[in-house]
Amino acid sequence: PHNSGRRQRQMCIRDSIRALNTGYNYGDTAEIFTTRYVVKKAKLAPGKYRNINGTLATCLGLLTAVEKSKLSLTFAGYPITPASNILHTLSNWKRFGVKTYQAEDEIAGIGAALGASYGGSLGVTASSGPGIALKGEFLGLAVITELPLVVINVQRGGPSTGLPTKTEQSDLFQAVYGRNGEAPMPVIAAATPGDCYYTAYEACRMAVKYMTPVMMLSDGYLVNGSEPWIIPNPDKMNDFDAGFVKENLTDEQYLPYKRNEETLARGWAIPGTKGLEHRIGGIEKQDVTGNVNYDSDNHEKMVQIRAQKVANIANELPPTEIFGEKKGDLLILSWGSTHGACKAATESLLEEDLKLSLIHISEPT
């Protein structure tokens, strides 16, 4: 019995030394971070939150816009990564009166969307860089016919097929300049997944108020990414009137290019409305009357009017918000989904007492 107790003590000591050595060797060789991170509670504004991705936020923004304007929504497009989920999501909302059409190609998609706008619905289409390139001719048609149209570019890596599953903010110049002739149109970009809601809503409002196509820039990071999102109160969203031209019951000729003095937008005349027959199409029209006109002076005037109409949108934008120092040595300009990275970098540099500021170009919410 005495020897048995001694052996047990020796075995206990041996096993304890083995455990000590094993633990020491593991700790000495394992690549374990020694820094401790404490995630503080987020400072969130009061309200009801849900988790949302950019795709759903975009679709909800479109739906809110047509509800507030009493319009119908017609989405026509062609599947392309990473924009396809917008079509998939909207196709499940027939109960809200949403019409979706999967076209045979990108050109047919935007053509159907523009045709829907011509018929009195709000036409929307979506694609990515290669598809937007194919839609260029119809974008020009939307500019010259002055019809409302929302085009969503969910950017990906390019050029050509490029990197379909990777994110890249490389389509800005394509969005601003990618049409033949003088064909300006508003281009706005979402900053976060939740911001896609407000950006989509604002794109619809601009398109209807100013009778113009509007390009909304998103990207794969935004539509697939998620964030906590405070559910907005629809009653606080501004209504906007579609402004359809009413019947012309007089003997006077309808003037399709007679414009709103404030916005320079022409009237939205629905086909089949009595007394509103007029010419429409891709050939230049005469100011006010809408007759076909090849005169150089008239063409210059129409080009300038269309450009000024888009420029007038800036009059309703609030002052630019500056994050950081009001005056400093460096100003960082950012747009789109770089918002989070640029803001975090600015905060870090400000803590090092560097005098710099950040302006993120985005649509105000």
Each language-model region and where it sits:
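Active-site/ligand-binding-proximal alpha/beta "capping" segment
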Residues: A183-R205
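Single conserved hydrophobic/aromatic residue that forms the stacking wall/gate
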Residues: H2-R9, I13, I359-T365
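Flexible, low-complexity linker and terminal segments
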Residues: Y37-G47, N51-G61, S69, T199, ...
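Short, mixed-charge aromatic SLiMs
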Residues: R6-Q10, R14-D15, P82-H88, G225-I230
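Flexible loop/turn segments at secondary-structure boundaries
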Residues: P82-I86, A108-G111, I132-K135, G157-T161, ...
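Thiamine diphosphate
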Residues: R14-G178, A183-M185, A189-A190
